[in-house]
């Protein structure tokens, strides 16, 4: 049975409506909700001469910014005070999704990249990587 719904939130203004839809789903199924933003290093961000320290600094800055964007969801009353907000970092998408503590019966929800027309049902590159590496079932909501 469904134990919790986690919403993957990239922190963009156009993705807030996906969070709102997941809030409604969590209420409908009477399960707790969590919102996660993934901060992933990905491939080498800079030439080797720059060093990993610069990449670590940029990743840490992005994670801090993501925490602010998540907090804004509560400030704007998009989500309730009981919703868990989390930033998860990783060197790649597999590592980031493995770093999450998943419950048995959990569902991961994410939105598509809104580009109009039929593109609304297609995932962007980040969404596709999340689906590929997710250890739990994924619900894809049209953006």
Q: Which role fits each region the language model picked out?
A:
Residues 1-2, 107-133:
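Glycine-rich, Arg-bearing micro-motifs that act as flexible, cationic patches
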Residues 2-56, 60, 76, 80-86, ...:
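Small/aliphatic-rich secondary-structure junction motif
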Residues 23, 71, 75, 128:
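Active-site phosphate/pyrophosphate- and oxyanion-stabilizing loops and adjacent acidic/basic residues
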Residues 27, 94-98, 128:
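Short hydrophobic/charged patches on amphipathic alpha-helices used for structural packing
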């Amino acid at each position: 049975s469904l134990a919790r719904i986690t919403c993957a939130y990239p922190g963009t203004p156009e993705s807030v409506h996906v969070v709102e839809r997941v809030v409604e789903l969590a209420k409908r199924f009477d399960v707790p909700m969590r919102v996660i933003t993934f901060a992933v290093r990905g491939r080498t961000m800079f030439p080797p001469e720059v060093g990993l320290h610069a990449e670590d600094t940029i990743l840490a800055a992005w994670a801090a910014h993501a925490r602010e964007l998540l907090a804004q969801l509560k400030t704007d009353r998009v989500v309730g005070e009981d919703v868990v907000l989390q930033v998860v970092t990783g060197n790649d998408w597999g590592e980031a999704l493995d770093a999450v503590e998943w419950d048995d019966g959990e569902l991961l929800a994410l939105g598509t990249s809104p580009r109009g027309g039929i593109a609304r049902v297609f995932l962007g590159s980040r969404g596709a990587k999340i689906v590929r590496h997710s250890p739990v079932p994924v619900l894809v909501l049209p953006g």
